[in-house]
Each structure stands twice: as C-alpha cells, then as structure tokens.
C-alpha cells in the first residue's frame, strides 16, 4: 500500500539538510548516504547521491524523471552472474 498523500514524501532529515546546504551554497558535491528508503524530491534535482547497496556506494545522478521514486530503486543490491551452462558431458555418463 502506498504512503498517504496527506503525510507527504519521506526523506531522512540528515539527507535533506545536506541537499539544502548544497543548494544554498550553490555546490554539487557527491552526497554519500545509506538511506535507500528516502524518496527523491525536486530539491535533489541535479545532485549526485551515492546510495549504499550493502557493499559499496553507487553514484546516482538525479534527473526529473526520478522524482517520486526511492533512492534504493537505483542501486541494485544483487549481482546476477548468469545461469550455469548446460554441460552435456556430465549428463551423458
């Protein structure tokens, strides 16, 4: 079930403070965060946010089409290594 509209979007306080201070200063440094649950708001447009995926921080450049989505959607946590090749020699026996 989606979040109620009367509550508004959830963004961690520490993250929105970092974005606001960079907007006031006019800088666009990479912001490192572990908050995958935070929603992307219009104030974040043009910023690069490094989102933690459990192992490393993946840089995500925020564009207009990302507004309304969560940061965690853009840093995958699982790596797909491919399916095992069908080995006919071992099956034949």
Swiss-Prot record:
It comes from Streptomyces coelicolor (strain ATCC BAA-471 / A3(2) / M145). This is Small ribosomal subunit protein uS19. One of its GO terms (molecular function) is rRNA binding. The keyword Hydrolase does not apply. One of its GO terms (biological process) is ribosomal small subunit assembly. Residues 83-93 have a biased composition (Basic and acidic residues). Belongs to the universal ribosomal protein uS19 family. PROSITE patterns: RIBOSOMAL_S19. Protein S19 forms a complex with S13 that binds strongly to the 16S ribosomal RNA. Keywords: Ribonucleoprotein, Ribosomal protein, RNA-binding, rRNA-binding. Pfam families: Ribosomal_S19. GO terms for cellular component: cytoplasm; small ribosomal subunit. Signal peptide: none annotated. HAMAP family: Ribosomal_uS19. It comes from the Bacteria. Residues 73-93 are annotated as: Disordered. The keyword Phosphoprotein does not apply.
């Amino acid at each position: 079930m989606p979040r109620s509209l009367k509550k508004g979007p959830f963004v961690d306080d520490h993250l929105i403070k970092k974005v606001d201070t960079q907007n006031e200063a006019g800088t666009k440094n990479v912001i490192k965060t572990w908050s995958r649950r935070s929603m992307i708001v219009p104030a974040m447009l043009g910023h690069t946010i490094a989102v933690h995926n459990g192992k490393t921080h993946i840089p995500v450049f925020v564009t207009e089409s990302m507004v309304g989505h969560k940061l965690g959607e853009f840093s995958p946590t699982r790596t797909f290594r491919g399916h095992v090749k069908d080995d006919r020699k071992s099956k034949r026996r």
